[in-house]
């Protein structure tokens, strides 16, 4: 993209429709959208997104970056279990961001820059369901899972590897059975980069949480 934000110019460089909408908004002297206060623009945006995603994905949270989206997803999954589960699973081939939680779930050690990780994170082999099952069995306590979330890129942009339909289908079944929050990170692959609006839409399954920030804004503020 010739900028510091890798993969953000999803809508082209200075697309005239986006520029016009931005200029018209400024001419009305409206304040920037502030997420600490109710905004009809944020409400309508969330409603519009819910109409293009599967029914189960009907609540939106709008952060500033892909890493913040992943941080929010991990926190929501942890809070879903009220802190009663302590373990997070991620793929050994992955990049989720450079913030503490996102970097803790990143499989490439050179991208975590030797910072400490959040506790109880475990990696499995990408696109290998037996590896997932092996770790899950180790982490069970009194036949109850200690895993609050599994995060994965269904299509890994860094390696150009993708998960098979069989792997994703069985992963979805396991997470549903064990009440584990399934997080799909499509920050790099979302918004039709793989043909479908999101890569997971090629398959008959839906994650519990989907991350797609960054290129969603087209490199502009307050899209």
What kind of region is each of these model predictions?
Residues 1-82:
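Glycine-rich loop-to-alpha-helix module at the N-terminal edge of alpha/beta enzyme cores
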Residues 18, 76-83, 103-113, 167-170, ...:
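A glycine- and small-aliphatic-rich helix-loop capping segment at beta-alpha/alpha-beta transitions
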Residues 46-149:
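PLP-dependent aspartate aminotransferase-fold enzymes
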Residues 53, 174-175:
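A generic structural signal for well-ordered alpha-helical segments
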Residues 85, 177-180:
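A short helix->loop->beta-strand "cap" motif at the edges of active sites that frequently abuts
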Residues 100-101, 204-223:
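Active-site PLP attachment segment
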Residues 151-165, 180-203:
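Conserved PLP phosphate-binding loop immediately N-terminal to the Schiff-base lysine helix
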């Amino acid at each position: 993209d010739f900028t510091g934000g890798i993969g953000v110019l999803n809508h082209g460089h200075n697309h005239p429709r986006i520029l016009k909408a931005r200029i018209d908004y400024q001419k009305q002297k409206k304040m920037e959208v502030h997420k600490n206060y109710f905004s009809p623009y944020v409400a309508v945006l969330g409603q519009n997104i819910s109409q293009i995603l599967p029914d189960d994905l009907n609540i939106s949270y709008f952060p500033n970056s892909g890493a913040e989206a992943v941080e929010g997803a991990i926190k929501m999954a942890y809070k879903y279990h009220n802190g009663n589960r302590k373990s997070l699973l991620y793929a050994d081939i992955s990049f989720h961001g450079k913030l503490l939680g996102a970097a803790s779930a990143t499989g490439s050690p050179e991208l975590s820059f030797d910072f400490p990780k959040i506790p109880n994170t475990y990696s499995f082999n990408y696109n290998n369901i037996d590896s997932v099952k092996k770790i899950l069995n180790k982490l069970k306590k009194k036949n109850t899972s200690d895993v609050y979330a599994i995060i994965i890129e269904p299509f890994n942009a860094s390696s150009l590897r993708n998960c098979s339909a069989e792997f994703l289908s069985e992963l979805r079944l396991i997470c549903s059975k064990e009440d584990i929050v399934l997080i799909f990170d499509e920050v790099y692959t979302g918004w039709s980069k793989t043909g479908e609006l999101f890569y997971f839409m090629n398959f008959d399954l839906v994650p519990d949480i989907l991350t797609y920030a960054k290129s969603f804004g087209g490199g502009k503020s307050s899209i």
